[in-house]
Amino acid sequence: MLDRKASRLRLAGQFKEMRMQALLVLAIVFCALPVRAAVPPAVEVERVRVGLERILNENIVPFWYPQVIDEKNGGYQLNHDSNGTFQGPSDKALVTQARTVWFFSRLYNSGYGGPEHLAAAEHGYAFLRDQLWDDEFGGFVWSVDATGQIATRPHKHLYAQGFALYALTEFATASKKAEAAGLAAELFYLLEEKAHDATYGGYMEWFRRDWGPGPKTGTYMSTPIDGKLMNTHLHLLEPFTTYAELSGDDLVRERLIELILVQSNAVLRKELGACTDKYARDWTPLLDPAYARVSYGHDIENVWLLIEACRAAGLPNGPLTDLYRQLVDYALRYGFDHERGGFYDAGNFAQPADAKSKVWWVQAEGLVALLYMYELTGELKYWQAFVATYDWIEGQQVDWRHGDWHASVAPSGVASGAKANAWKSPYHNGRAVLKCLQILTQMNRGASTVE
């Protein structure tokens, strides 16, 4: 009896010890988990919201409207130096003409714009339709001269076609014009016919004006011959997301899901935790030394565009949240200025940034990605990085004297770069401010923009 009693006591002791060990393990695990739903001070949230409204209403919108409207030739005049002074007529590129149509349309749709901004969008839409659209072969040429009468770069690149679809979709939403929605549908199905890669997924990018294979040199972008770019497919996510919402078309949703797979898998170097840009047609990464670099801006932009794409496709974001965290955390580790706020431009694999200028569009995309990550995860570190990025933008990237944002700010603090040109428009920073205001407003109401 004594032996059995002793045995039971030993077993009870062992069970108690095992239970304590299990509880200890659970405690360690839970302590290691991120703190969720950490709430920033209300006064800080309001400070940022008010500041973003000021940037939009006093810095961004007044710079672009009405001075870029070309009343004589149509479209927008986008050739302004670092002080915002117009430098004279220049070619009109599809990328920035379309981005500016998108911005004025989105400004109107957001409620921050008025009828004058819808009219500005319609002015640009007419130029896309009448001057940049190729009546003979379909699709849009890359650029025309200042008058819109001569195609200075007549070939077709999917990067620019994507922005045309983005503009048409947003303008159709703003104007309720069936013509704009019809042109968007025509463009989508043209890209389906001419550019979709049914063998390897994604889209071929570079074509002659007649949609034959593009010339072997002068690709307008850095697309490898017969290859693909993460950058191009990143910027197909945007229009396919909004066009899926506008059209309700099953094929658009199918192609959107395909792009989600590309942008969450094919372009990711999983062992690194970051994306690279250049690929062969079959998505084999091209990792020559010049290509083995990380663009922090593209990686963090990819995160929030994927979040919105999943929502539009009716897919939950939960399965991809670890990927989002991986990409943003990589950028925060290697490409973030933890002293002054803001993101650097680029760097080698798993190394601190070596291109340390702060480029306007990188700050804009970082702002949105960080706020989305805070909303999605509740992790306060993303809110803190968001505020630090906002403070950098408000204090250093915004040009309060001449309007809009400095294109680039060097580590020394010297600003440089044009305010408007073939690559700079109100799209990145205007969109970022509008998007963050939308998210902050919904957060204040207790609603979520992420599912």
Language-model segments: what does each one mean?
Residues 13-19:
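Short, Lys/Arg-enriched N-terminal segments with co-localized hydrophobic residues
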Residues 7-13:
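Short, low-complexity intrinsically disordered segments enriched in A/P/G/S/L with frequent Arg
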Residues 17, 24, 236-238:
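Intrinsic structural disorder/low-complexity segments
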